[in-house]
């Protein structure tokens, strides 16, 4: 999903806008030179000294202004997203609206999240204060060029931290547009800085004494590398990594509605979402009909120009992404998986993979264990909820999941048994500003969004006050 700070067998791609629908390289951008990095970090540190001292209400007002500007620039920003990573234009506009809602949420609610929390004590007073930490590095992916950045940057800017952004090399113009938007809203120079970093220079940033933490949304491999660097340099980190989310169907009053939800949960953003419904688990008595209808639904998604409002299936983010996904699909086919729909690259220019439904996937196949980052669904037959839970929890990932049942008590019972950070009932796993987002196991740690995301990079400082004549108690610790 995002570039890994670890050495790769593939050559490092430059920051460039490459239209995944046409293959055209629209614009390239030079890497930041290593020698330039320390000055930019020091500028961010100096900005923190001033930005962090401003009243939180002032910082929050700037976030609300950023939300207004984002909505005003919807067409421009959405067009950039579609150009750079191939998202359907209507979905790109939805991403802009979601990102703006996050900016506005922290602009409105942020100050209350930072209010001191008093602790009842026998004598005197005790409170926990929420203070900023300083300069933070965000490493963000291409699949949601605005939303992913904003869910990290907005709460931390309101807290009083300053932000350095290393965005994906696939969406440099989106990165620059967001930087300009923050500055136009009133975020001072240095408080939010886009960096076109080489992978090899990420450690230099994390290691710098002024940098207090790092947040990464990306692949498992990238997360492991960043966690290693953060640990080596004793920096706080938050990781939102891959997912292979279960979508469990226990019963259905309206099977068509459930199938539609499964298709939406799998094919939104051409399937390039960490929380997409990648592993579908359906009970015996519904399985055959569910698979048949899902295959028909997937087959109706025809590739086309993502900027055309009538298009239902956009390209993947790059030709390399399409080749990688097709290799996973072909591995499953070669080893005996059944293709219900799709299974091939369409005869259409662009980075497309046919919407694919696979069954009879077994543990010797890559598709059983690996995240499929594109429009491919794997459907499993299960006897009952116990088998569904066991299969769901057999994954090394633990990001999100969905449970569908007309019996809400039953669905709730299953949800509580899933080893994931999020579970949605009778709805595909999704995201909203006021709901915490994050996973467990190899899907990462820490939370973004809601009040929980706002407090990740704060100094939760205890202040304990005694009357002046209080006799000191025995000290321990």
Curated annotation (Swiss-Prot):
Enzyme Commission number(s): 1.2.1.79
Keyword Repeat: no
Xref: InterPro entries: Ald_DH/histidinol_DH, Ald_DH_C, Ald_DH_CS_CYS, Ald_DH_N, Aldehyde_DH_dom, ALDH_GabD1-like, GABD/Sad-like
UniProt keyword annotation of Oxidoreductase present: yes
Reaction catalysis annotation: succinate semialdehyde + NADP(+) + H2O = succinate + NADPH + 2 H(+)
SUPFAM superfamilies linked to this entry: ALDH-like
Entry keywords, A to Z: NADP, Oxidoreductase
Gene Ontology MF terms: aldehyde dehydrogenase [NAD(P)+] activity; succinate-semialdehyde dehydrogenase (NAD+) activity; succinate-semialdehyde dehydrogenase (NADP+) activity
Positions contributing to NADP(+) binding: 142-143, 166-169, 218-219, 241, 371
GO biological process assignments: gamma-aminobutyric acid catabolic process
Pathway assigned in UniProt: Amino-acid degradation; 4-aminobutanoate degradation
Pfam short name (any one): Aldedh
Entry annotation: catalytic residues: 240 (proton acceptor), 274 (nucleophile)
Role description: Catalyzes the NADP(+) dependent oxidation of succinate semialdehyde to succinate.
Name of the featured protein: Succinate-semialdehyde dehydrogenase [NADP(+)]
Taxonomic source organism: Deinococcus radiodurans (strain ATCC 13939 / DSM 20539 / JCM 16871 / CCUG 27074 / LMG 4051 / NBRC 15346 / NCIMB 9279 / VKM B-1422 / R1)
Gene: ssdA
């Amino acid at each position: 999903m995002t570039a890994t700070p670890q050495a790769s067998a593939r050559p490092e791609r430059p920051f460039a806008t490459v239209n995944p629908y046409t293959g055209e390289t629209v614009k390239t951008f030079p890497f930041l030179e290593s020698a330039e990095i320390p000055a930019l970090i020091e500028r961010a540190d100096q900005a923190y000294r001033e930005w962090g001292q401003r009243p939180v209400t002032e910082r929050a007002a700037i976030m609300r202004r950023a939300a207004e500007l984002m909505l005003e620039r919807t067409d421009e920003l959405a067009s950039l997203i579609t150009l750079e990573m191939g998202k359907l234009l209507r979905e790109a506009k939805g991403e802009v609206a979601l990102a703006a809602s996050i900016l506005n949420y922290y602009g409105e609610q942020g100050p209350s999240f930072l209010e001191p929390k008093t602790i009842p004590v026998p004598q005197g007073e005790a409170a926990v204060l929420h203070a900023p930490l300083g300069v933070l590095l965000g490493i963000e992916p291409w699949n949601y060029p605005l939303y992913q950045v904003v869910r990290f940057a907005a709460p931390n800017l309101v807290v009083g931290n300053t932000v350095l952004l290393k965005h994906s090399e696939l969406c440099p113009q989106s990165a620059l547009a967001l930087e300009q938007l923050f500055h136009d809203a009133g975020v001072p120079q240095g408080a939010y800085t886009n960096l076109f970093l080489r992978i090899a220079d990420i450690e230099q940033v994390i290691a710098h004494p002024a940098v207090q933490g790092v947040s990464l949304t990306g692949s498992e491999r990238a997360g492991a590398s960043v966690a290693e660097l953060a640990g080596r340099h004793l920096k706080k980190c938050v990781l939102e990594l891959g997912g292979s989310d279960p979508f469990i169907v226990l019963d259905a009053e309206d099977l068509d509605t459930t199938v539609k939800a499964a298709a939406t949960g799998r094919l939104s953003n051409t399937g390039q979402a960490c929380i997409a419904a990648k592993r579908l688990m359906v009970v015996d008595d519904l399985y055959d009909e569910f698979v048949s209808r899902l295959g028909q639904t997937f087959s109706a998604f025809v590739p086309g120009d993502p900027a055309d409002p009538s298009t239902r299936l956009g390209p993947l983010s790059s030709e390399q992404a399409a080749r990688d996904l097709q290799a996973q699909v072909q591995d499953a086919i070669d080893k005996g998986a059944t293709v219900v729909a799709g299974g091939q690259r369409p005869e259409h220019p662009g980075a497309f993979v046919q919407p694919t439904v696979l069954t009879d996937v077994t543990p010797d196949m890559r598709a059983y264990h690996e995240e499929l980052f594109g429009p491919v669904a794997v459907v499993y037959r299960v006897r009952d909820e116990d088998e569904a839970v066991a299969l769901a929890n057999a994954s090394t990932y633990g990001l999100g999941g969905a449970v569908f049942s007309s019996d809400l008590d039953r669905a709730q019972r299953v949800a509580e048994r899933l080893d994931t950070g999020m579970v949605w009932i009778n709805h595909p796993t999704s995201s909203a500003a006021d709901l915490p987002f994050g996973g467990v196991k190899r899907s990462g740690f820490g939370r973004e969004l809601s009040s929980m995301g706002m407090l990740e990079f704060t100094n939760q400082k205890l202040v304990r006050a005694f009357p002046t004549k209080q006799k000191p108690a025995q000290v321990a610790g």
